[in-house]
Structure formats: structure tokens, C-alpha cells
UniProtKB/Swiss-Prot annotation:
This is Apolipoprotein C-IV. GO terms for cellular component: high-density lipoprotein particle; very-low-density lipoprotein particle. It comes from Rattus norvegicus. Pfam families: APOC4 (PF15119). Belongs to the apolipoprotein C4 family. The gene is Apoc4.
């Protein structure tokens, strides 16, 4: 059970980290993703070149597919929808909650109070 709770607590931070990494990679110019030229006769440089051959098209395709998401319209639409769904009537909801909480607390206090001390003095 504690492992499940730990996973639920770390999931938002993991998602935020992945989102941050995606933003960072998407904002990098393509030139910075190409490897710096090194000695061509080294085996590691051949491996690095082969990996970059495979990874670079994948990164480019992913960036092109998700470009719409990073545009201002997508972010603006998300913020507007979030506001309309969650924040638009926050003031009236908060006032109603405070009023009902106060009434509930007063009723609870009144029911716990002895009749002699909390008697309604207006009725006589």
C-alpha cells in the first residue's frame, strides 16, 4: 500500500519532469543536436554517428508532430478551458462554503452547549 502511495506522489513530479524535458528539447535548435565532429577512425565515433543517424529523424518527426501543442493557441485554449471549468465561479463557491461551514459550526456548538448557558434569551 505504501509503495502505491509513493507512486501516486511521484507521478506528478515525473510527468512534470518529462514535460520540462520535452519543452527543452523542442526549443533547442536542430544544429545543437548534431554531434561535434571527432576522429572518424574511432569505433566509438562510428557508433555515435550511427545512433545519431537513427535518433535525429525520430526527434525531428516528434518535434514536427507536437509543434501545434507548443503554439500559443493550444496553451491559451487550455488555460481558458481550465478557468471556465474550475475557477470561474470560485468566488461564489467559496462564499457558500464559508457560510455553510459557519452555520454547521454554530449548530454543532449550540447542540453541545448546555441549555442553561446557551438558551435563546430572545424568547424569554
Amino acid at each position: 500500500m505504501s509503495l502505491l502511495r509513493c507512486r501516486q506522489q511521484t507521478l506528478p513530479s515525473l510527468c512534470l519532469s518529462v514535460l520540462f524535458l520535452a519543452c527543452f528539447v523542442a526549443s533547442m535548435p536542430t544544429e545543437s543536436l548534431t554531434p561535434t565532429p571527432g576522429p572518424e577512425n574511432s569505433r566509438w565515433s562510428l557508433v555515435r554517428a550511427r545512433v545519431m543517424e537513427m535518433v535525429e529523424p525520430l526527434v525531428t518527426r516528434t518535434r514536427d508532430r507536437w509543434r501545434w501543442f507548443w503554439g500559443p493557441r493550444a496553451i491559451q485554449g487550455f488555460v481558458q478551458t481550465y478557468y471556465e471549468d474550475h475557477l470561474k465561479d470560485l468566488g461564489p463557491r467559496t462564499q457558500a462554503w464559508l457560510q455553510s461551514s459557519r452555520d454547521h459550526l454554530l449548530n454543532k456548538t449550540h447542540s453541545l452547549c448546555p441549555r442553561l448557558l446557551c438558551r435563546d434569551w430572545t424568547q424569554g
